[in-house]
Amino acid sequence: MPFSERRKYPRVPEAVTCQVSVGVERFQTLTQNLSCGGTLCSLSEEVAPMTKLEVVLDLPASLGAVRVPRQSVRCVGVVIRQDRLPLEDRPSYLTAIYFTDLKPEDRRRIGEFVLQSMFSHDRRRS
């Protein structure tokens, strides 16, 4: 049986500065990958699945040779899954976040960033 990708949006392996808030607790982190549908990042605390989070992504001002203005994207998401990273000195949890409330213009900004990143990665391979 052939493999079928279930993701609705393409994702890219980009480290984007990200602030995640759970109630009054805030975590500063970097994404490991990003799409219009969500992100994967590392958090220092365990967060239960389906916990609602506030996410602020600081999309970079440039990506390779492509120059774009720096943009912040704010949205709401939920934790889909979390896996403890085994070889860390301090607790660290790889956290998958699904964006549940994202303004259309912010989804477009992330989409443009993802496309530029994909283009940049393709150019590096050729």
Give residue ranges: language-model regions.
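Short coil-to-beta-strand transition motifs
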Residues: P13, V66-V76
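Short beta-strand-centered aromatic/proline hotspots
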Residues: T29-L30, C75-Q82
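N-terminal helix initiation/capping motif
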Residues: M1-L34, S42-E46, G111-S126
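C-terminal output/interaction extensions
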Residues: P86-S126
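Short, conserved beta-turn/loop elements at beta-strand boundaries and strand-helix junctions
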Residues: G23, C36, Q82-E88
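Short, charged beta-turn/beta-strand-edge "cap" motif at the junction between a beta-strand
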Residues: E46, D58-L63
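Residue-level recognition of beta-strand microenvironments
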Residues: L34, E46, I80-Q82, L102
